[in-house]
Amino acid sequence: MPELLNPAPVAHLRHLLRAHSPLVHCMTNDVVQTFTANVLLAVGASPAMVIDPREAAQFAAIADALLINVGTLTEDRAVAMRAAVEHARQAGKPWTLDPVAVGALTVRTAFCHELLALQPAAIRGNASEILALAGMSAGGRGVDTTDTAAAALPAAQALARRLATVVAVTGEVDYVTDGERVLSVAGGNPLMTRVVGTGCALSAVVAASAALPGDRLENVAAACGLMKQAGEIAARQGGPGSFIPAFLDALYQEVQG
């Protein structure tokens, strides 16, 4: 049975982010780069978006953590991502995979399955993405999920056990597992699905949390909790137009306040 995340790991994550300010190398999609960078800054991390194949490998060894998000995958970007992951591993730096639309599109599905052999520290995806990554479903409708997070939990657990990693399957309730333990994270607001980039930005915060000391499962679950809390606060402003600035303010005040 999943254990509900309690407030203590979220409070501890805030402290760790302030104390360590991890540098996160975000090889993320073109749609969300600015928002992702601003979210990382709001939580006390430092973002960098280095995507040229000639530089990505070098920088991956410098950064504290690496995020691979395949949302706008290209052939050149795949080369850069592969090199970055390999150099991050050689340097002992954790990397996180966000398998955007895996299962719905064949090229990215094959690429993400290839990357799984390179031992991600964490994986963050919606239910359809995690099911497809685990080989249990054909996938969802692009970036949208057609399954519930609870339905994908067995796939997440199997994937986590097979890869010795932490898997976060996110939705109305998030489930975070290392294959044995499962933490559930409730909260958030439907407005989080009506603006672009909240899931991708969460993956960046997950990447930051994976670089921090302590229990990685709790750190990743706390990252989910931190984002859901900010979403609840930001939704009080009204609609999607006011949501993004309110969300950034809420994150900043949660961590720095």
Curated annotation (Swiss-Prot):
Residues at which ATP binds: 124, 170
Tell me the GO molecular function terms. Answer: ATP binding; hydroxyethylthiazole kinase activity; magnesium ion binding
What does the UniProt record say this protein does?
Answer: Catalyzes the phosphorylation of the hydroxyl group of 4-methyl-5-beta-hydroxyethylthiazole (THZ).
A Gene Ontology biological process noted in the UniProt record is: thiamine diphosphate biosynthetic process
Q: Which family does it belong to?
A: Belongs to the Thz kinase family.
The biological pathway it contributes to is:
Cofactor biosynthesis; thiamine diphosphate biosynthesis; 4-methyl-5-(2-phosphoethyl)-thiazole from 5-(2-hydroxyethyl)-4-methylthiazole: step 1/1
Could you identify this protein by its name?
Answer: Hydroxyethylthiazole kinase
Q: Please tell me where substrate binds in this chain.
A: 49, 197
Q: What is its EC number?
A: 2.7.1.50
Highest taxon in the source lineage: Bacteria
Statement: the UniProt record of this protein carries the keyword Transit peptide: no
